[in-house]
Design a protein with these regions (language model features):
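Conserved pre-ATP/AMP-binding loop-to-beta segment of ANL
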Residues: 20-23, 157-184, 191
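Short, conserved catalytic or interaction motifs in soluble domains
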Residues: 68, 92, 187-190
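AMP-binding/adenylate-forming domain of the ANL superfamily
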Residues: 2-24, 43-44, 62
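Conserved AMP-binding/adenylate-forming core of the ANL superfamily
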Residues: 24-74, 78, 95-100, 148-154
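AMP-dependent adenylate-forming
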Residues: 12-36, 137-142
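A broad, structural micro-motif
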Residues: 35-36, 147, 174, 180
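Structural core segment of the AMP-binding/adenylate-forming
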Residues: 82-155
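Conserved S/T- and glycine-rich ATP-binding loop of Class I adenylate-forming
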Residues: 63, 80, 111, 179, ...
Length: 191
């Protein structure tokens, strides 16, 4: 059974088939924890993959992700993988200089940030010139480089409906040899 599963996408798809209505994620909303099923997560993941394709993301593009743990973090990471992108996760504990180094060194084209850390990103924006779009989770921002994650989700859903085969081709092109993550450890920067 495991021999057929060669990518993270394969593993996730298998879980969606086996447990479609089971809770996959829990997130606190309005003071109470609410479950999101595997199939609901998959829909959000595909919407984000579609949004990335609509933005012009190419296979193997790097996408930095600076956020506390939340459902959108999972949608983002899996959506990147479905679209053939490479996740560059950034700890919220990093200094501004460490964020700049990782974003620049990884050559990230896109940066996903939660609204809680938006001011930090605004403070370093001039130092991360390779980033073309900054996607903000839990925000309604839509100005210049900045765009709301939630808005992209809606646009991604529309794009997906109009370009189903393009997205399916993108997903089928993902192989077990693809780079999916660039993780910087404490010794990575040689500082």
């Amino acid at each position: 059974m495991m021999k057929d599963m060669k990518t993270v996408i394969d593993l996730f798809e298998r879980s969606c088939e086996k447990f479609p209505d089971n809770p996959y994620l829990w997130e606190k909303k309005n003071g109470k924890f609410a479950a999101t099923s595997y199939m609901e997560v998959k829909r959000e993941v595909l919407n984000f993959a579609g949004a990335l394709c609509q933005l012009g993301m190419d296979r193997e593009d790097r996408i930095a992700l600076l956020s506390e743990g939340c459902n959108a973090w999972v949608y983002s990471e899996l959506g990147m993988l479905y679209a053939g992108g490479v996740n560059v996760p950034l700890s919220i504990k990093l200094t501004d200089n460490e964020i700049v180094f990782r974003v620049e060194h990884s050559q990230a084209r896109f940066l996903i940030v939660s609204a809680n850390f938006l001011n930090r990103v605004r403070g370093i924006e001039g130092r991360i010139g390779g980033v073309e779009k900054i996607i903000v989770i839990h925000s309604d921002i839509n100005e210049g480089k900045y765009v709301s994650f939630e808005l992209l989700q809606r646009e991604g859903e529309i794009w997906r409906g109009e370009h189903k085969e393009l997205l399916n081709d993108r997903i089928r092109a993902v192989t077990e040899d693809d780079l999916v993550n660039i993780s910087y450890t404490s010794g990575t920067t040689a500082e």
